[in-house]
């Protein structure tokens, strides 16, 4: 996402005011500034962030750009010392329940681990346990979201191959985000999750811990007078971002529904020409060609619809959950600040002015400063991740659409020789 002009820095952290923070998909930002990223191809040669030019002479440039973006990500991996992947989902059936486990593989050079490699199996509730522990032990940090646990029965089969694969990708992304975090990745519970063969002994009262943590920050009895401007801007931006994502999600689902209905019509449409060809000796090949074209177009549309359902929508929903996590951290920060303001006010209005500042007030002030610093750092990290994620998402969407139209174009172009040959043969006969 390009920046519109020179941003006006806020006093304490350099964050933009809400008027200057633009949604990553908004056109308003480009309207304010003629950024090099949004110039027309005729005005400026397209290039990657590293300066490599992008060839726009053919539709294949989108695929090339997608591959180069992935190579840029591979370069970042050279500086990492902790690699985590989630794969190999397996279904387990017992007399009590049916569930899915996933293999979690870890490779690391960190001294906090006893071995350089681990391979353990975890189910969804283990991932949930980890997130609860991270929220409890790291309340000042933004914890990445997990995919939603519950699904509507009768609408989604939670044991279907498509659902399990979508969840696997989300769980893999969750662990990778934690592993890339400079603080969360060193958490003892994360270490246990990656290395312990059995988490049952470590899980303990996770639910009670979460309930206690919730009560601690929600029922503190302190009322915040007002958020600092930078945190107020964060809250307003999150509200706006939620609205934009919700709108895109609803429209995308309507598009998928319409594409699915169109796909069903195409599947009925093509065979009609094939059936017709059996009664037309002279038109047999052209009619069979049309039937094949429609069949190829329907297959291409099916792939496009599946990509939108399995790759595009999950990213939108992940960021909706991410926003909820960020809002929860903001609320916790507000509670800590409200507690500090209340205690400080009590000290200011006390009769004995010569008594030193109470220790609990100083500790509360330290908590506020720590919360602010951690939240600002996580906000910057989240913004960077968001830009990268949406850049890859939109580039991938463009690439898939180009492939779809290329396949349809090739299918219909293949029909032209059949029609021309038929016309030439008819002319020779006459």
Swiss-Prot record:
Organism: Danio rerio (Zebrafish)
Protein family according to the UniProt entry: Belongs to the sorting nexin family.
Protein role: Involved in the regulation of endocytosis and in several stages of intracellular trafficking. Together with snx4, involved in autophagosome assembly.
Primary site of residence: membrane
Membrane topology: Peripheral membrane protein
Biased composition (Polar residues): 1-18
Name of the encoding gene: snx30
Annotated ranges, domain BAR: 223-428
A single Gene Ontology CC term: early endosome
Protein name (record): Sorting nexin-30
């Amino acid at each position: 996402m390009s920046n519109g002009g020179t941003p006006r820095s806020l006093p304490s952290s350099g964050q933009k005011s809400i008027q200057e923070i633009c949604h990553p998909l908004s056109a308003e930002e480009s309207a304010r500034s003629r950024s090099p990223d949004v110039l027309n191809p005729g005005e400026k040669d397209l290039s990657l962030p590293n300066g490599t030019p992008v060839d726009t002479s053919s539709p294949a440039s989108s695929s090339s750009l997608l591959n180069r973006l992935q190579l840029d990500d591979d370069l970042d991996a050279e500086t990492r010392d902790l690699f985590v992947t989630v794969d190999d989902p397996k279904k387990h059936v017992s007399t009590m329940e049916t569930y899915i486990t996933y293999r979690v593989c870890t490779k690391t050079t960190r001294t906090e681990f006893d071995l350089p490699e681990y391979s353990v199996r975890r189910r969804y509730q283990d991932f949930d346990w980890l997130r609860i522990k991270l929220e409890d032990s790291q309340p000042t940090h933004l914890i990445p979201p997990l995919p939603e646990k519950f699904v509507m029965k009768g609408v989604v089969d939670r044991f279907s191959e498509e659902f399990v694969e979508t969840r696997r990708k989300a769980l893999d992304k969750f662990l990778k985000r934690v592993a890339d975090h400079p603080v969360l990745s060193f958490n003892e519970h994360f270490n246990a999750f990656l290395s312990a063969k059995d988490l049952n002994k470590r899980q303990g009262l996770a639910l009670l811990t979460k309930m206690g943590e919730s009560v601690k920050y929600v029922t503190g009895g302190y009322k915040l007078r007002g958020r600092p401007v930078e945190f107020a801007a964060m809250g307003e931006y999150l509200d706006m971002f939620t609205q934009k994502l919700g709108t895109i999600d609803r429209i995308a689902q309507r598009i998928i529904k319409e594409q699915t209905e169109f796909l069903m019509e195409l599947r009925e449409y093509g065979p009609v020409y094939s059936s017709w060809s059996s009664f037309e000796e002279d038109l047999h090949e052209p009619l069979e060609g049309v039937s094949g074209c429609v069949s190829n177009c329907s297959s291409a549309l099916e792939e496009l619809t599946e990509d939108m359902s399995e790759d595009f929508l999950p990213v939108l929903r992940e960021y909706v959950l991410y926003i909820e996590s960020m809002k929860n951290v903001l609320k916790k920060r507000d509670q800590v600040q409200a507690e500090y303001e209340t205690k400080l006010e009590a000290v200011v209005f006390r009769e004995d002015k010569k008594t030193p500042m109470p220790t609990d007030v100083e500790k509360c002030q330290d908590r506020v400063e720590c919360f602010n610093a951690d939240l600002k750092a996580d906000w910057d990290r989240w913004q960077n991740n968001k830009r990268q994620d949406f850049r890859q998402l939109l580039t991938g969407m463009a690439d898939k659409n180009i492939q779809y139209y290329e396949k349809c174009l090739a299918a219909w172009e293949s029909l032209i020789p059949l029609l021309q040959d038929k016309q030439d043969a008819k002319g020779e006969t006459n």
